């Protein structure tokens, strides 16, 4: 661009490509570093008691620009005003980020995503539900595998490394908790995970 080989009317297009690829490589590097923590078997969880609703709100707000551009709304349905869990706050924030990122990525315009919390005994359940394209039944067991994308058409235009859900599952399992997925093609997907009450 500096030497004038790219015409001014094309510069915006190429800058967007550069930005997209920079973000993709940043995401890949972050994901690989996170997976490396799990591979060393030395993953130390920094567990504290914190308000999961505050973390959900902050994570949802970080997607405000993307949601506005796609006309997607994120609805938060909370069991109570405050709800404390005992977990690694930074890692749970990463779980929520990855799940919301996927929900937005695979949702169409003018759609909504719901994040809901429920309490059952000593457990807190967090659900992230979208009205997106859904996951084929044949792929449901494979989505947790590293670098897995359900098919070329699903991943072709979608920014992603295929590591997000693998990281999500490993973080939840490191907390000795569970994560499940319910999905119907053409209807949407719901991820539900549990945490210990704090």
Feature-to-residue mapping (PLM):
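Short helix-loop "hinge" at the ATP-lid/N-box region of the Bergerat-fold HATPase_c
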Residues: 103-104
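Conserved catalytic submotifs in the C-terminal HATPase_c
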Residues: 46-50, 68, 73-83
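Short helix N-cap motif at coil->helix boundaries in the Bergerat
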Residues: 52, 134-145
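Conserved glycine-rich
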Residues: 176-177
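Short alpha-helical segment of the dimerization/phosphotransfer core of two-component systems
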Residues: 20-25
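Short beta-strand/loop element within the Bergerat-fold HATPase_c
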Residues: 110-122
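Conserved micro-motifs of the catalytic ATP-binding
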Residues: 6, 10, 40-45, 84-87
